Design a protein with these regions (language model features):
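Flexible loop/turn segments at secondary-structure boundaries
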Residues: 60-63, 85, 152-153, 199-203, ...
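Active-site loop/helix belt of alpha/beta enzymes
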Residues: 150-287, 350
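Charged (often Lys/Glu-rich) extended helix/loop segments that serve as interaction or gating elements
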Residues: 19, 253, 262-404
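A charged N-terminal "starter" segment
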Residues: 1-141, 180-189, 216-224, 389-404
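Structured core elements
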Residues: 74, 97, 118-120, 144-146, ...
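Short acidic, glycine/serine/threonine-rich loops at helix termini
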Residues: 65, 88, 108-113, 130-133, ...
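Conserved, mostly hydrophobic/aromatic
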Residues: 34, 57, 79, 111, ...
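Active-site-proximal loop/turn and secondary-structure-junction residues that shape catalytic pockets
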Residues: 56-60, 81-82, 102-104, 123-125, ...
Length: 404
């Protein structure tokens, strides 16, 4: 994304032309950026060739997942719907891992039938259910056990998953009990130790701590794991000059870990693969100036992009047509939904805007459309993928007749 003659472009496409043809709000994805992200991720960990399973929850568009599959990735899924979507996108079942704390018997049965690589179990009750279903089907099922390493990922509490108060995984004592339990099962093959400490992680040190905990527990368990699933969580820079994850140091920590563990590493990245490929184009409906606060009211809303309302997350917001006419006022960029939390960002010194002007919210490729809803009975926006000068519609705009 860059400005050419003060006009914002995504790859080789003028954003104004996109808005004119497809309307607003509209999601756009850069294929070039997607390709670069996957290439760089593989390069960062090329010394041990991990299995990279894209976290489907971050973006569930089947066309986008097909592109990700073509670039060599598998899938991490957390529901039967995501598993179906991954298979529909052509991802090899042997490159799919099924995570999540609340898999139903229907979901477990479907995963077994599809012969996916691993079901990562998160409780004794779940393992008992897997064993029961596998026994009925007369099959042996490969599973992992998700460990909760009680490691602070130094991220937002809403997206922390590796501390003892979080619902995910099992504690050390329970982990050893479950390893022992699976040793006596005729229908379960314990292949993997799984761990995932959080999302939007920008510091390598929590990963180092996590690896130390995992290493000690594996040695203590005496079990030979074929796979170590380290989850994902690698963060991206949502704001200018923000901190970036040091992949080199994380890579070194994993290489040191692998000196004593002869297992295949699995990653489950989502945000780091698709986060910065996405842009949400929106139009100014009204400019509302009050005594205490001034507002830019957009046609995009929290139902289109939930992260700011849900986490207090901030997405860089920029004008589509650049101007040197800067306002001295502070504006809050909000949507039309009847909730006070329907706001995106607050900016002082933004360029002066008028009604029908266009803005773009950046880095919305992960947990943007996948968290969207029809709240206030608003149709969901379309999704486009841009390759050079070509625009492909990968999901059409919903119509009111589809909702009413």
């Amino acid at each position: 994304m860059k400005y050419i003659n003060k006009n914002l472009t995504i790859e080789k496409v003028n954003v104004q032309k996109i808005a004119k043809k497809y309307g607003t709000p509209t999601y756009c994805y850069s294929h070039k950026q997607l390709t670069e992200n996957i290439k760089n991720f593989k390069k960062n960990f090329s010394s041990f060739s991990p299995l990279i399973c894209f976290a489907v929850k971050s973006n569930t568009n089947v066309s986008l997942i097909r592109e990700i599959r073509k670039l060599g990735l598998g899938a991490d899924v957390v529901s039967i719907g995501e598993l179906m979507m991954a298979l529909k996108a052509g991802i090899d079942a042997k490159k799919i891992v099924f995570s999540g704390v609340g898999k139903t018997s229907t979901e477990i049965s479907y995963a077994i039938d599809k012969k996916i690589l691993l079901i990562n179990a998160e409780s004794k009750s779940e393992i008992i259910e897997i064993e029961k279903i596998a026994k009925l089907k007369k099959k042996i099922v490969n599973i992992g056990i998700r460990l909760n390493p009680n490691t602070d990922a130094k991220t937002l509490k809403q997206i922390s998953t590796g501390k003892k108060e979080n619902k995910f995984g099992v504690d050390e004592k329970t982990f050893f009990e479950l390893v022992n339990f699976t040793n006596y099962s005729k229908n379960i093959n314990l292949k993997c130790l799984s761990v995932h400490i959080g999302s939007q992680i920008l510091d390598h040190k929590p990963y180092e701590k996590m690896l130390n905990v995992v290493n000690k527990i594996i040695k203590k368990s005496g079990h030979n794991f074929e796979f170590i699933d380290l989850g994902g969580g690698m963060g991206i820079s949502y704001e200018k000059n923000s901190k970036k994850l040091n992949y080199q140091k994380y890579n070194i920590a994993i290489q040191n870990f692998l000196k004593s563990q002869k297992a295949k590493i699995i990653f489950e990245p989502g945000r780091s693969i698709v986060g910065n490929i996405g842009f949400l184009i929106s139009q100014v409906i009204y400019i509302k100036e009050n005594i205490k606060k001034d507002f830019i009211i957009l046609d995009a809303a929290m139902n289109d992009l939930m992260r700011p309302a849900l986490y207090g997350a901030n997405h860089q917001t920029i004008p589509v047509v650049k101007s040197n006419n800067i306002s001295k006022k502070t504006y809050e960029f909000v949507g039309p939904i009847c909730e006070s939390t329907d706001k995106f960002t607050t900016i002082k010194g933004f360029q002066k805007l008028k009604e029908k002007d266009l803005v773009v919210m950046c880095d919305v490729g992960a947990y943007g459309m996948s968290l969207s809803s029809n709240y206030n009975l608003r149709p969901k926006p379309p999704e486009l993928i841009i390759k050079g000068s070509k625009i492909n519609i990968i999901k059409k705009r919903q119509k009111l007749k589809d909702l009413i």
